[in-house]
Amino acid sequence: FDGSHLSLPGMNAEITMRPHQLDAIWRLLQERSVLLAHEVGLGKTLTSIAAIMELKRLGRINKAMVVVPNHLTLQWQEEALWAYPLAKILCAGPKDLSKQKRGEFLSRIATGDWDVVIVPQSSFKLLPVGIEALNDFLNGEIDKLRNFLYQNADMGRSAEKQIQKAIKHYESRLANQASMQKDARETIVWEMLGLDMLLVDEFHAYKNLFFPTKMSRVAGLANTNSQRAFDMFIKSRFIQQNGGRFVGITATPVTNTLAEVFTLQRYFQYSTLEKLGLTHFDPWAKLFAQAVALPEMSPEGGGFRINIRLAKFVNVPELSTLLSQFCEALKWEQVQTGTIRRPALHQERPLIVELPSTPELEDYIAELAERATAVRNGTVSPEFDNMLKITSEGRKAALDMRLLNHLLPAW
């Protein structure tokens, strides 16, 4: 994508966009679903603002909503007004989506001719989806899960219980949804806001999207049923299915597990996965990932154990082709020309400074190992001790034992 021809009318004349930003803007003008995965410092925010304003100027969109982390709400508004002083921007304040003012704010979104509507991450989930649209979506998800159970009757008990739990969760939402949306202040719902573009900053915050799988013994598949991710999935699918645009921004698209690649594909190219018969994780993993048994240090730091993880991609050219259809990935090394340069690291890599252990730390690690064994054997109540508590205290101990006992001497 070559955006060198873009002139960006209406932008602050003091701003000079870099070549990679113009290229990204041109891609956002051409495609409806894009993950902008540029490294930190490459100007993703300004690129996104310029793309929205250019789409609006060309009549390609009517109204865009930008979802940002709470602490960045005002920063986004200020940068947008700096770049486009004449932009019509509606920015949600701390109380605009409270129960008392939500109806008024939704009315302002729906009836105003806004270029950009900026809402904080915590408030986005308060924008209600209409009963009919939500019921259709939830019933569809329930049917998919039930079909998965039927087609995989040989799955392990743990995996089956997890899927049954998700079904009950969706059924509970179906039962409660009607009464929740009878409030007169929420009569304006997501479908009525007039949005045809949704742009999400720090998109990695929505990676915990539930998917059914038989791989209950594979470590690293943190398959939690995140309400925040599911809400984003519903609204993004509605935007896409109605011809709108969906854009995610993040410097860390994949952080913990290969399964996050599948989640990104569900968000940004679901229709492609449907055509390929890969909407479920297990056939996707069979095609693109390989489970490997590897020795790993135990979470409590008391020894090693063998874990099975999806640690290797296979059929990489085919997967790369699919990802390139929506993912705009860029590293500093690719743009370090002219005035865009990052200082080099000493010896071209981070330096590891080793510190000697202490008797107190070694004793505490041994204690953590005993606690972890008790948790795995089920001899201790989760309310009293659990792996999350053990790993959290282990990190504190590794940093400084005084975080656990302030009476200890300094190292």
What kind of region is each of these model predictions?
Residues 2-37:
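Conserved pre-motif I regulatory segment
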Residues 31-36, 62, 115, 244-245:
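Pre-Walker A (Motif I) flank of P-loop NTPase domains
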Residues 32-51:
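Walker A/P-loop
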Residues 37, 67, 250:
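Residues at the beta-strand->loop junction immediately N-terminal to the Walker
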Residues 47, 60-89, 96, 122-123, ...:
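Conserved Walker A/P-loop ATP-binding site and its immediately adjacent core
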Residues 53-54, 81-84, 133-137, 214-222, ...:
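Glycine-rich, phosphate-binding/catalytic loops in enzymes
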Residues 55-61, 268-273:
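Post-Walker A helix-loop "phosphate-sensing" segment adjacent to the P-loop in P-loop NTPases
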Residues 102-149, 158-161, 165-197, 205, ...:
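Inter-lobe coupling linker of SF2 helicases/translocases
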